[in-house]
Amino acid sequence: LAAGKLTLSMPLGGGTFAVGSEVTYTHRNDDYINEENYVPSSFSKIEELNATGYAEYNRSFPWGDWSLGLRYEHVKFDYYEDDKHIDEQSRTFDNFFPNISFSTKLGAVQTQLSYTAKTQRPSYSQLSNNVYYSDRFTLQKGNPTLRPTIIHDLTLSGAWRFLQMSLSYSQTKDLILFWGELVNDDASLTMLSNRNWDESIPMFTAFLSATPKIGCWSPMLSVGVQKQWLTVDYFKVQKTLDNPFFTASFNNTWELPLGFMIGLDSYIQSAGATQNIYNDKTYGYVNLSVRKSFLNDALSVELKGNDIFNTNKISYSMYSGDYYLYQKSAWDRQEFAVTVRYKFNTAKSKYKGTGAGDSQKNRM
């Protein structure tokens, strides 16, 4: 991976105008060797050039702040198998992504309304055509013909004292779904892969959080709901997956004398649908930690128990064409950890920029 990024800003018309560019080049080899010959060994290569240009203008008025931006992305994707260029799976994408936001203060309430168009590109493992052996009934592979997901998002947010609120409505095009298809006539073998969903998927999310400070206690309570509108084909009938799911988290820290800090974090999520998966039970966890600092916080020792009630277990159903998967996962995440940390050099970095190629690193 090679990446470079440049941003220039200047005053213009009472506001600030910024232009920039980011270029990344990625070369990835993906070799899968199966000596038992359950599936054929395969050797693939991906080369991707991503060139981006963007411009943004910000200006403040007595009645509010405006921000306007436009981003252009050019992506050249080349796919190779056994060092041979595969033309039908190599593509070029050119997209424009605008964004606009307006923020103002209504009394004591700070509000913002924003519209953003953005993309989520598939991970490189999702783009690999190598076939992986899961078990005697299941094979798995990526899909080099995947298109990037395009998201149009409209968000209204507000803040008052220690309360924050967010309402969001989005339309997602070409969402990448995990999908299963039967390989042979007797339905004994299934190929799991990824596919783009051709129809646009609406989604609504709402979150409310509170972050007060009460003496030595700093609680953070957050509740939210997410609902999608999605109907998939399932054994030649339509399966509607529009069940909303609710989440809640309650994180707490207590700063005590003598450098002690106690943390108590909890999370819970209800049953509900996300993409073509339905989680059919509520799950969550509780974590507890105690931290002691020494030497003006240069040295710290932390004792932490994760999932102390052993409740982080999920079960879900996946609906995809002629394939149905029910999976129950009981992760062994109940653990006790001891962390000793010493800060050798606490001087702040003078570097003021942002990292180039961060989105590409996340796709690796």
Briefly describe each language-model feature range.
Residues 1-82, 105, 109-110, 163-165, ...:
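Face-selective signature of the C-terminal outer-membrane beta-barrel domain
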Residues 100, 241-364:
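Conserved C-terminal beta-signal and adjacent last beta-strands/turns
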Residues 45-48, 88-91, 119-173, 191-204, ...:
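Outer-membrane beta-barrel signature, preferentially recognizing the C-terminal barrel domain
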Residues 12, 23-29, 59-63, 72-78, ...:
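Transmembrane beta-strands of outer-membrane beta-barrel pores
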Residues 4-10, 53-59, 100-104, 154-160, ...:
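Residues on the lipid-exposed face of transmembrane beta-strands in outer-membrane beta-barrel proteins
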Residues 1-7, 42-46, 50, 147, ...:
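Outer membrane beta-barrel strand-and-loop segments of large Gram-negative receptors
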